[in-house]
Amino acid sequence: MIEVVVNDRLGKKVRVKCLAEDSVGDFKKVLSLQIGTQPNKIVLQKGGSVLKDHISLEDYEVHDQTNLELYYL
């Protein structure tokens, strides 16, 4: 189990617990429940690269306490 920190760049930080093997799409579903937004309205970035829904967090080298940027569509 890892904890990922998601920052929406408007001052809101959300900590989400998940598994490293989870896909980005599954992670967005968990995140959307915490922030009250639909998963298809969320874009996640790490280091300026947009994360694709079908790839796992582990493949993007997202580890415990990794920071991701959150953008709304």
From Swiss-Prot:
SUPFAM superfamilies for this protein: Ubiquitin-like
Chain segments annotated as coiled-coil in the UniProt record: none
Keywords assigned by UniProt, alphabetized: Ubl conjugation pathway
Any GO CC annotation of this UniProt entry: nucleus
Keyword Iron belongs to the record: no
Boundaries of every Ubiquitin-like domain copy: 1-73
GO molecular function, one term: protein tag activity
Entries under Pfam families matching the protein: ubiquitin (PF00240)
Alphabetical GO biological process terms: cell morphogenesis involved in conjugation with cellular fusion; mRNA splicing, via spliceosome; positive regulation of RNA splicing; post-translational protein modification; protein modification process
Functional note: Forms conjugate with SPH1 and HBT1. Involved in morphogenesis.
Name of this chain's protein: Ubiquitin-like modifier HUB1
Naturally occurring in which organism (per UniProt): Saccharomyces cerevisiae (strain ATCC 204508 / S288c) (Baker's yeast)
Gene designation: HUB1
